[in-house]
């Protein structure tokens, strides 16, 4: 190849690279503009259903940069339990109503492949004892043959950092192949409810009966779930409509399903058809990385969010139209 040919080839390569980079930047800009337009349009349509009030309770501690699940203790007043998303060890964190870290508990015998949600309810063998149910159910790549829910007797944060033993494990498979899930709730009858988060499939919920939970907690036997049922939440990533957590109210008759941009409310238990309790509560850009949700006894909702480049996430409380006090 001549020197001129080498120069021409190099020039073409550099020029081609520049064109490629410009094209990528342009495509990203177009996509970003479309998403911004979709969010703006959604805000105009849904703004009337924003929370009637919202207050910051505190900023999440550095140890909880990816806070995911959230429950409010009924045994220890003013205590909130949470955990990190994938990337952390099997740890539970107790925080107070200002998001101040109270204690950290290592869970012996548990793995933390992708913890995504948690629920609070009676222990399988003792309804008088409070247990934390932690869902290791994240599966963005749809590659996990089975997932699991860990059961831990609720510890006392006043003892400080410590280790807790695993009380039981509920391993399970879905009837139709892998799912990615980010929601877990426990009913007044101690059934477990798992809610999916998927970009191209309608949101579903699967139930694990209390009797199966007790059996699995004793022997760790694999549970094969029955067919799930759909919730009327069509995923739309451009406006943040992807499920990140769920919660049942204290009466057990309202299921809140939060996404990045909205909170949906459904009558529970679901009978022949799924019915909404109220219009979805529009969060908009309040929590672009919103994750956890839990009902207070007064019907207001406590929310958590992950850290962003701007700083730590928040612990917030909101009141949504048509729900709670």
Language-model features: locations:
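Sequence/structural signature of beta-propeller domains
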Residues: 4-325
């Amino acid at each position: 190849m001549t020197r001129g040919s080498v120069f021409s080839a190099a020039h073409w390569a550099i020029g081609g690279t520049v064109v490629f980079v410009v094209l990528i930047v342009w495509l990203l800009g177009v996509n970003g503009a479309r998403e911004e337009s979709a969010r703006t349009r959604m805000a105009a349509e849904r703004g009337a259903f924003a929370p009637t009030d919202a207050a910051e309770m505190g900023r999440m501690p550095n140890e909880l940069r990816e806070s995911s699940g959230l429950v409010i203790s009924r045994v220890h007043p003013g205590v909130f339990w949470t955990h990190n998303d994938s990337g952390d060890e099997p740890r539970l964190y107790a925080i107070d109503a200002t998001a101040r870290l109270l204690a950290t508990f290592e869970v012996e015998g548990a793995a933390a492949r992708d913890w995504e949600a948690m629920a609070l309810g009676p222990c399988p063998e003792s309804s008088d004892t409070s247990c934390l149910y932690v869902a290791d159910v994240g599966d963005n790549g749809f590659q996990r043959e089975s997932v699991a829910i860990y059961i831990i007797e609720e510890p006392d944060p006043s003892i400080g950092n410590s280790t807790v033993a695993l009380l039981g494990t509920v391993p399970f498979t879905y009837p139709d192949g892998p799912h990615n899930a980010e929601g877990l709730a426990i009913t007044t009858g101690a059934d477990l409810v798992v809610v999916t988060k998927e970009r191209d499939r309608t949101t579903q919920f699967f139930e694990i009966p209390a009797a199966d939970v007790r059996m699995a907690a004793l022997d760790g036997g694999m549970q094969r779930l029955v067919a799930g049922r759909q919730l009327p939440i069509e995923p739309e990533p451009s406006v943040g409509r992807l499920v990140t957590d769920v919660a049942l109210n204290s009466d057990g008759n309202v299921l809140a399903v939060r996404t990045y941009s909205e909170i949906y409310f459904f009558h529970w238990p679901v009978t022949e058809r799924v019915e909404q309790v109220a219009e979805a509560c529009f969060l908009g850009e309040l929590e672009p990385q919103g994750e956890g949700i839990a009902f207070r006894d007064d019907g207001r909702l406590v929310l958590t969010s992950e850290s962003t480049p701007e700083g730590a996430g928040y612990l917030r409380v909101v009141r949504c139209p048509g729900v709670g006090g």
